[in-house]
Amino acid sequence: MRNWWITGGNGFLGRHLQAQLASGPAVSLQCPRSAEYDLTQAADVSRAYQALQPEVVIHLAAKVGGIGINREHPAEFFYENLMMGVQLIEGARMHSVHKFVAVGTICAYPKFTPVPFSPSERSSSIT
């Protein structure tokens, strides 16, 4: 049985992922809340890796709000989400995690991005 850590496991996507994984092959799911670990801080992330000992990490956690709050504090949202990813990826490397999956948000793409979006497409309209 593999030990999995799902960051953001108690959010919308995380709850659905937990339900899917629970119906599949046996895995041990760990989904601690953000109050336990500040994923923007290297010390907290290291402490989490040591305590949870995950073999697989699914990174779904993000600082989110709504369109209004995102527009009021774009740098804060960008910074905190970036730091979570950086700290978790480095922690995974340092703790020899077998598999790391990070999920992004549509908020990271330009305002007028065609759907479906292709990484080869570029836009000068970045919000």
PLM regions and their residue ranges:
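Short, well-ordered alpha-helices that flank and scaffold nucleotide-derived cofactor binding pockets
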Residues: 15, 19-23, 50, 62, ...
